[in-house]
C-alpha cells in the first residue's frame, strides 16, 4: 500500500470517527422530573410521541421490593434508590452509545428528588446530552391528582415525604446541567409547547 493509500485510509477513519462523535453529541436525553402526581408519565409520553422517540418510565426500573414498600406507605431511603438510579443511568448510557438506532432523542421520567440522585443518573453523561425538566405545582394540586390516580403502587400518603426531601437544583447544578422549570397548573398541550420552546 502506498503512502497515498495510507493517507486516504487514515482520512476515511478520521472522518468516520468524527461523524460518530457528532452523532453522539447530537443525542439528547430529556428527563421529566418531579414528585409523584406532577404528571411525569403523562408529559413524558406526550413529549416522546411528539418527537417520535423512545420513552422509559422510571417505574420500570424499580424492584418489586421497592414497589411493595411504596404500596404499603413506606418511604424509600437512599439505599433503596441506589440500584434503581444506577439502572436508569445504565439505560441512558446505552442509548447514547447506540449509534445504529437512528434516534437522536430519548425521554425518561425520574423523580430525581435530591441533588445526589441527579448526580447518579447523570454519571458519565455529557452536559449537552442531558436536559432536566422539573415539573412544579402546589401541594393541593399534587394531592388531588394522587387521590384520583388509579391502579398505581404509589401510596398518596407518601407525598409529604417526597416534598420534604425535594431539593431544587443548586447553582452548581444549574452550571453543570441544562434545566427547565415548568408549572403543572397549565394544560398538557401548554406544557408540551413550553418544553418544545426549550428544545429549539
UniProtKB/Swiss-Prot annotation:
Its EC number is 2.7.1.12. GO terms for biological process: carbohydrate metabolic process. Belongs to the gluconokinase GntK/GntV family. This is Probable gluconokinase. ATP binds at residues 34-41. The lineage of its organism: Eukaryota, Amoebozoa, Evosea, Eumycetozoa, Dictyostelia. InterPro entries: P-loop_NTPase, Shikimate/glucono_kinase, Therm_gnt_kin. It holds the Pfam family SKI. It catalyses: D-gluconate + ATP = 6-phospho-D-gluconate + ADP + H(+). Pathway: Carbohydrate acid metabolism; D-gluconate degradation. The keyword Kinase applies. Keywords: ATP-binding, Kinase, Nucleotide-binding, Transferase. One of its GO terms (molecular function) is ATP binding. The keyword Transferase applies.
Amino acid at each position: 500500500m502506498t503512502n497515498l493509500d495510507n493517507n486516504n485510509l487514515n482520512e476515511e477513519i478520521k472522518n468516520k470517527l468524527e461523524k460518530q462523535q457528532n452523532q453522539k453529541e447530537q443525542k439528547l436525553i430529556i428527563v421529566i422530573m418531579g414528585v409523584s402526581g406532577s404528571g411525569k408519565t403523562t408529559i413524558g409520553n406526550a413529549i416522546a410521541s411528539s418527537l417520535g422517540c423512545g420513552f422509559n418510565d422510571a417505574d420500570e426500573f424499580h424492584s418489586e421490593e421497592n414497589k411493595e414498600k411504596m404500596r404499603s406507605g413506606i418511604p424509600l431511603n437512599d439505599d433503596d434508590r441506589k440500584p434503581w438510579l444506577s439502572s436508569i443511568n445504565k439505560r441512558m448510557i446505552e442509548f447514547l452509545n447506540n449509534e445504529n438506532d437512528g434516534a437522536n432523542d430519548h425521554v425518561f421520567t425520574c423523580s430525581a428528588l435530591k441533588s445526589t440522585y441527579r448526580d447518579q443518573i447523570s454519571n458519565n453523561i455529557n452536559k449537552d446530552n442531558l436536559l432536566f425538566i422539573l415539573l412544579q405545582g402546589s401541594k393541593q394540586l399534587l394531592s388531588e391528582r394522587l387521590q384520583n390516580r388509579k391502579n398505581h403502587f404509589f401510596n398518596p400518603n407518601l407525598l409529604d415525604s417526597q416534598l420534604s426531601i425535594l431539593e431544587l437544583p443548586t447553582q452548581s447544578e444549574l452550571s453543570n446541567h441544562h434545566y427547565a422549570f415548568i408549572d403543572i397548573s397549565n394544560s398538557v398541550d401548554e406544557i408540551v409547547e413550553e418544553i418544545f420552546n426549550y428544545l429549539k
